Each structure stands twice: as structure tokens, then as C-alpha cells.
């Protein structure tokens, strides 16, 4: 376990860049003083932010580059233009070279995934990485993946997601056999596309020792905590994520309006202020910011591009905790024990079922 957690930040990533990244890192540093930062980006912009935060400046090293990946760049464009020179690439490369323990970026998701996959490579048996997040539910927390790394996927890919997600749940939640559900438009076995129905059939047939497959889960089942792990291909998973975050913000706005509408409601708010604060904190989507790229030989955390400093701080916290508690090593050990053999035999089972 490292004495200091070394975090490489893509300081130019996101909708705003350094003016969110640096203040966000400062908030995280206040929570985790045993952190050091490598900051990649425009030195002038970064140092202007650091000037207001001497404690952050004291534990940071700035590496200048004026090449930044735009939010609208296609992954192929980002690789051509920004490979080995962009702030995003350099942050990931620091992890590969052992100069940093984790890279955090709020930049272009497709470009970040392409660069991370190209530079860090995937683990044996994993064809495509996934973005996994931890969501608050009525029953506690659930691991949800894929949140947008890969659009679409066959039954074998969905099974790989189930195995990676269950490995993460075993480590994070201390579960021997996490429950796993496939996100679908209904719970009946006939519902959904061919790929998801094949994945369900495959998971039932294999009856894996490291996870308990419970079948299909509808969208409202995520918030209910219907399973410890919710699996979806990246398109649907990202829509579910954005819908949940939007609903949380909408609810908070409605609540603020209701509590300030009349004198009586304002008085009532004063008496229930503690309860409302707890509810607001629980539903704050910024606290769930920070998706972990699973399936790579290194830790990369993706923050929302449009988040504020507080939200980015939570993404940095995720990276810190992945390193401090050695979660990636533990997840990979679980995959090594169970995942690779399972995925290798899944194709044979799938062929037999067809």
C-alpha cells in the first residue's frame, strides 16, 4: 500500500477544465491529506488556480501541455491528435509508467476509454472494459455497469459485465455471492432483445459460484436495490444514469419550491430541516460521480464533464479509495480466480444452448 496516493489529473478535461478540476482536487485533498497530484495541462491556467490554494500547490507537480481533447472529438480523432501529447493521454500514461496510482478525467468519455484501452490494455479474457458506478438505493448501494463505455454487446459481453460487476461487489460490499440482474424492459423471460435473452439463458445455465443471477430487472428496480449488481450494455446504462440524476435534481427543485411557497411551509421546514438535509444529501447526484473503468491493467476514473468542483471532488475520492484500499488488485484477483475460466467456457455453453 503506497504511503501517498498519487493521482494524475487531466486538468483540461470536462466542460470547464482547470477552474473545476483544481478546486475539486482541493476539496478532495482536504478529506484525504495523504494525496499527491500530477496535473497535466496548460501551466498558466493551472498555476493561476493553484495560486489560490497553497496547500494544493505544495503537493502538486504541473506537467505542461497545450493539447487538450475536445468534448466533441471522436475517439479516433483524439487518438490521432492527442496521443502522447494531450493532457488526457499523459494522465493515463503516468499510471502505466508507475508515476501515478490512478488517473482521473472529466473529459470526453469515448476518447478516455479509447486511450485507456490502448495504453493500459485489457485484462486477460476481457474484450471490452466497462464503466462501473456505485449507486445509492433503498437497500444500500448497488454496482451498476456499463454506464457508457461500449454501445451494444452480445451475450458473451453481457456475461463478462456480470462477472466484473460481481467481482467489484464482492470487494466493496464484502459479499460472498452478490445478486446480479440484467436491466431490461420487463422481468418476463420473453422480454428484451435477443442478446439480453441469450445472456440470461447463459447465466442461468452456468449457475456461477461467484454470483447469483436473479433474472431481469426493470429500470425502477435500480433505485429499489433489486440486485447487488445491475448489468446493462453502455447505451441503456448511460441513459439510466442520466435519467436518475435528472430525476434527483428535479425532485430537489420541487422540494425547495414547496418548502418556500407559504409561511406555514417555511415554518414547517425549520422544524424538519435536519431531515430535509439528510434527504438532499442522499439524493445529491454529485455524490455518485466517478465511474471506474473495469477490465484494465490500471485504474482510470471518469467524472461527469458538466459537474462542478464538489462533484469532481467525489470522482477524485473514488480514485483515492480504489488505491488506498487496493480495490483494483482485489477485484483482479477475484477475476483471476473465477472470471477467466468462466468466460473461456461460456462460449462452449452458449454454443451448446444454441
Curated annotation (Swiss-Prot):
Cell location: Cytoplasm
Biological or metabolic pathway of the protein: Lipid metabolism; phospholipid metabolism
Main location: cytoplasm
Enzyme class: transferase
Domain of life of the source: Bacteria
Recorded GO MF terms: phosphate:acyl-[acyl carrier protein] acyltransferase activity
InterPro entries to which the protein is assigned, alphabetical: FA_synthesis, Phospholipid_synth_PlsX-like
Annotated disulfide bonds: none
Gene3D superfamilies registered for this protein in UniProt: Isopropylmalate Dehydrogenase
Cellular component aspect of the GO annotation: cytoplasm
A matching Pfam family: FA_synthesis
EC identifiers of the protein: 2.3.1.274
Role summary: Catalyzes the reversible formation of acyl-phosphate (acyl-PO(4)) from acyl-[acyl-carrier-protein] (acyl-ACP). This enzyme utilizes acyl-ACP as fatty acyl donor, but not acyl-CoA.
Assembly information from the UniProt record: Homodimer. Probably interacts with PlsY.
Protein name, UniProt field: Phosphate acyltransferase
